[in-house]
Amino acid sequence: MKAVMLTGLRQMELRIVPEPKIKKDTDVLLKIERVGVCGSDVHYYETGRIGSQIVEYPYITGHECAATVKAVGKSVTRVKAGDTVAIDPAVSCYTCTQCKLGRENTCYKLRFLGTPGQ
């Protein structure tokens, strides 16, 4: 598959990379159709970092995406192959106090897809 990768400060390349595979029963394999460029992508391009999040090159950019579901793991029930989805790059823990109160966006352990080191 093709991926746009940061290869150094202010350097990008379109590369061919191995296509991911379903590994867990909860995995969903997506074909990315469109990707937005957000502020964090610009920071990674210009400076190679945001605070303690430092890019290790080469690095695939983009985390705000629209995609088509290609395949799903055995236990996935909410989407199926062929569905169109929008990606929320925020990944909540669902176990902390904030998550239990329904405030997943303020999760104490919030992580973001497409972020170095996460």
Question: Where is each model-derived feature located?
Answer:
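Glycine-rich beta-strand-centered segment in the early N-terminal region that forms part
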Residues: I22-V35, R49-K100, N105, G117
